[in-house]
Design a protein with these regions (language model features):
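Helix-to-loop junctions at the C-terminal end of transmembrane segments
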Residues: 75-88, 175, 296-308, 390
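Extracytoplasmic gate region of multi-pass secondary transporters
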Residues: 43-47, 168, 238-287
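Intracellular juxtamembrane helix-capping segments at the cytosolic ends
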Residues: 131-145, 347-362
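Extracytoplasmic
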Residues: 24-54, 136-137, 167, 263-271
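Helix-loop-helix hairpin linking two adjacent transmembrane segments in secondary transporters
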Residues: 146-211
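Cytosolic juxtamembrane N-terminal segment immediately preceding the first transmembrane helix
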Residues: 1-36, 52, 238
Length: 422
């Protein structure tokens, strides 16, 4: 008797990245990631510029980060409520409108040469950034098969890296290059008038885009394109804050963004004081470090096929503890290379904490997204009130402080990420 071959099951076909009907909408939404990456890192250029032109202290210049990331905290829940009431498209238009309004407010603020007025303008601008970030993640989730949403979000965060790299390059060219020659804020007015015009144009264009019905409309507990929610799943009987892995994700994101905000706020100061770079040149090295962050996201996406995301997160946190120890020694080029390397390991932290925290939340996922985004307030408080007083004496020694933050992120990746199934 001739043995018959046992048929082998075919490997499952991976779900499509997105669908043809969503391509135009997808391009617009992905562009939002680049826009807010640009807006966030531009603030770190202004930090140094305001020190030189407005003669504010290093600690007080960190109010730039406080205004920027504090807006994320303020807008987190309102953006979520607006999105549920009016839908994703109107949420995006609201975010872009606030972004453009804040950019245009920088013009009279620069004319007045008022640090407080400039902070107010940045706060309005960052309210737009926070709204975009709260809306864009669940919006992307609906632009295709839910099984491929992780790939869409990871790809979009890589595009965010392009904007993040562009911020210091553009800011260094327009702003820091002219600091000593002009001694005023005219370059700030030029830069932000261009940004306001571009962002406003995108808002107008997006208002004319016809968004097809989203797949998320058929997922329990998610927003529809027109607003409102679909039915609640039976699996999510617990209240949101009874999900301990979500609560720990909020804590981990708070400390993660605190460390990131502090590192970015004093990067240029470190380059000028310990390596002898000009502010303009240090800004380009900051961009180089953000290229490393973008590469880290692509590499992390690949490695997650073989290594559990929580393990990569824990490893990255340990690596950055070591980097901070090197930076704090101010050993010239060696320490500066370690400072550049911090962003490489930052790369996977925000999206990984975000995705781990949203697992198995059912009807709570949308509100949970807003709370995790609100964790960005750590970047508002830590640079000014924790690192700032130390940086006034020693910028290098201030880099001991983020070690505490990375220890918390490590604990989340090693233990507290687990979903408890009661």
């Amino acid at each position: 008797m001739i043995p018959t071959a046992i048929p082998q099951p075919l490997a499952p076909t991976p779900p499509p990245f997105t669908e043809r009907r969503y391509v135009v909408t997808f391009i617009f939404v992905v562009s939002l990631f680049m826009l807010w990456g640009l807006g966030v890192t531009m603030g770190d250029i202004l930090n140094k510029h305001f020190q030189q032109v407005l003669h504010v202290s290093k600690a007080n210049s960190a109010y730039v980060q406080a205004a920027t990331f504090g807006a994320y905290f303020v807008m987190g829940l309102p953006a979520g409520w607006f999105m549920k009431r009016f839908g994703y498209q109107k949420g995006v238009i609201l975010g872009l409108s606030l972004y453009a309004a804040g950019a245009f407010l920088m013009i009279p603020a620069a004319n007045a040469a008022s640090f407080g007025f400039l902070l107010l303008a940045l706060f309005v601008l960052a309210c737009g950034l926070g709204t975009l970030e709260a809306v864009a993640h669940p919006f992307l989730d609906g632009l295709g098969d839910p099984a491929s949403s992780d790939r869409r979000i990871t790809f979009s965060h890589a595009i965010n890296g392009i904007g993040a790299v562009s911020g210091p390059l553009i800011g260094g060219y327009f702003v820091l290059r002219g600091t000593h020659a002009a001694g005023d804020l005219s370059s700030v007015k030029t830069l932000y008038s261009i940004i306001g015009a571009v962002v406003g144009s995108i808002a107008i264009a997006f208002s004319f885009v016809k968004v097809p019905p989203l797949n998320a409309e058929h997922t329990p507990g998610t927003a529809t394109a027109e607003g409102g929610t679909s039915p609640t799943p039976l699996a999510a009987d617990k209240s949101l804050f009874q999900h301990k892995h979500f609560v720990w994700a909020c804590v981990a994101q708070l400390f993660n963004t605190a460390a990131q905000g502090g590192t970015w706020a004093y990067f240029i100061n470190y380059g000028t004081e310990y390596v002898g770079l000009s502010s303009h040149t240090a800004a380009y090295f900051f961009s180089l470090s953000l290229v490393g962050m973008m590469i880290g996201r692509f590499l992390g996406t690949y490695l997650m096929q073989f290594i559990a995301p929580n393990k990569l997160l824990a490893f990255a946190a340990l690596a950055n503890i070591g980097m901070c120890l090197l930076v704090a020694q101010h050993w010239g080029t060696v320490s500066f290379v370690a400072l550049i390397g911090l962003n490489f390991f930052f790369s996977i932290m925000f999206p990984t904490i975000y995705s781990l925290g949203l697992k198995d939340l059912g009807r709570h996922k949308q509100l949970a997204s807003s709370f995790i985004v609100m964790g960005v307030v750590g970047a508002a408080l830590f640079p000014r009130f924790v690192m700032g007083p130390v940086a006034n004496t020693s910028v290098a020694h201030a880099y001991y402080l983020p070690i505490i933050c990375y220890a918390v992120v490590f604990l989340y990746g090693a233990k507290f990420y687990k979903v408890q199934r009661d």
